[in-house]
Amino acid sequence: MKRFFLLFFIFLSCSSDNQSLILKSVTVKDFKEFIDDSNYITDAEKYGWSIVQTDVYNYEIVKGANWKRPDGINNSIDSLPVTQVSYNDAIEYSKWADVRLPTYEQYWSIVDDDHRLIVSDNLYPILPTANVNIVGNVWDITELNNSDQVRLAGGSIFCSIDTCHGTQRDRELYVDKETGNIHIGFSILIE
């Protein structure tokens, strides 16, 4: 019997660390607290423009598009995921908040257990983070994996089985460290 408990304890000790991790989408409200506290200037703000995706295939470069005005016109909404942020911006937020970005593998391991609505197929707009599965709302920036390219996870409202397959784990989409877009945000790991 002792042997059984010892083996059981070893099994529990070796089980996935992801069970103790929570993946939280960073909202506009969260990001605003960071900006207000640190006076950080995002890559999109430095450049004075960013990419605004209009559908899965088309985009525009829009002056004034940044996390405060993702489409360059309308104010962002506190309860929505922050968008128009780059990898660089996500890293600075993570340092400030003393958290970290998930790896691509951690991201998928955690979201596999989330059974809330997946927003994609252009059926819904980007929705408040508390109401939906992280997958399919906005692309999430993940931690670098021995590369200068940033792998995005989870897909966005523009993805579907017929287009970019973003909500599929084996989909590969990379951007550089300075790229933001109206449907790119980030989530953080909370232990």
Which functions belong to the PLM regions below?
Residues 19, 129, 134-139, 150, ...:
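Residue-level detector of short, conserved catalytic/binding motifs and their immediate flanks
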Residues 77, 126, 183:
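Short coil/loop residues immediately preceding or within conserved phosphate-binding loops
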Residues 140-146:
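Short beta->alpha transition motifs characteristic of CBS
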